[in-house]
Amino acid sequence: MPTSTLERDSGLLWHPYGPLDAGAHFSVTGADGPYVELRDASGSAHRLLDGMSSWWSVVHGYQHPVMDAALTTQIGSFSHVMFGGLTHEPAVELAERLVAVTPDGLDHVFLADSGSVSVEVALKLAVQYQLARGRDRRRFLALEGAYHGDTTGAMSVCDPVGGMHNDFAGLLATQLFLPRPPLPEASAAEVHEWLVKAENLVDAHGAEIAGIIVEPLFQGAGGMRPYHPAALQSLRRLATEIDAVLIADEIATGFGRTGSDFACRAAGITPDVMCLGKALTGGYLTLAALLCSGTVADVITTSSHRALMHGPTFMANPLACAAANASVGLLIDDETSGWAPAIGRISQALETGLAPAMRLDHVIEARVTGGIGVVELDRPVDVALTTRIASEHGVWLRPFRQHIYTMPPYISTPAVVDTITKAIVAAAAAHGDGCEFEVAS
């Protein structure tokens, strides 16, 4: 009879992107600051630095006193009410905060359950906008290498070839895709070539396109890849020319992760719709937000399609909104511990710490974008090997495909980042010729 958490988990619970019998490497027994307390199959305890910020969300670390206090206060009042026909202070305060800190013109807010759901709502919003304009446009233009979530609509705008959703191709709407945008260091000729392809595709299909959806300036789970701001700027222009809704998926990039508060602002553009998540609640509870321009909202509201047809049971959950208000306050309002000083400190430490990886023959690139550090190998990552090497160095990492990467919590000191980068370089080095691989999914 299984007794440990790991034994009881095995074959009972599915874990992300894995078979039922994959199980877990560790069970979690506690967490504080940038650390997670883990127990392995032998019962041994480990205290590891969370180099993943729990999939990029726990930016303030674990058991942050401001976050804990916000949730304790709210739960003493009420933990949940339906949002149909009712409102509450945490939701209104959060919406006001988000309108204030995001690029000008994003004046209306929809609070969703998760990042994927916010993308679903954004796609529906774009279709309703076109219907309100008297146009039956239902297709979307997206980028190869994109990742926008695992729900049905979101899957349809993820990379159609190299993505994770090939098994569901027959289920999904057929969308339009541009090649991966040029890298930030691309030549003027390479940028121009991509822009011409974008213009040609829009010229050919503009009458079908309800919206254009992008991860601004950095593609996350589709390959951990930054791209040239001219690509985003051109998509803003093309969306305007054909009156398509430009959707910026800032779920991963928002609140400073790429080195600016929002990647759209760094590129000098304002989307029609912006999706936010992950850092929004500091990883305490699931919540995402969609912000919409007054122009798009007004067109829908004054038409026969005036209701936005989406309403989750846990929409605007008060506990999640309280967490988000505390998180946004820490990220934006605190000049000493906000995102800007944190990312500046982390970025510098990542640059220094990952540089040795470039001496390895099987490393294609070691790249830093704001608070994101990535080592790309010329071969698939061995997940078990990477997990073992990283844990021996005191770090929890979760690599994928050819990438060993980190998005450290914003509370990370240079010493913490140094420990994380040493683990990444050691794990990368262990993939040298002669090793056997368990291919990452």
Regions found by a protein language model. Give the residues of each.
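Conserved N-terminal phosphate-binding loop of PLP-dependent enzymes in the Aspartate aminotransferase
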Residues: M1-S441
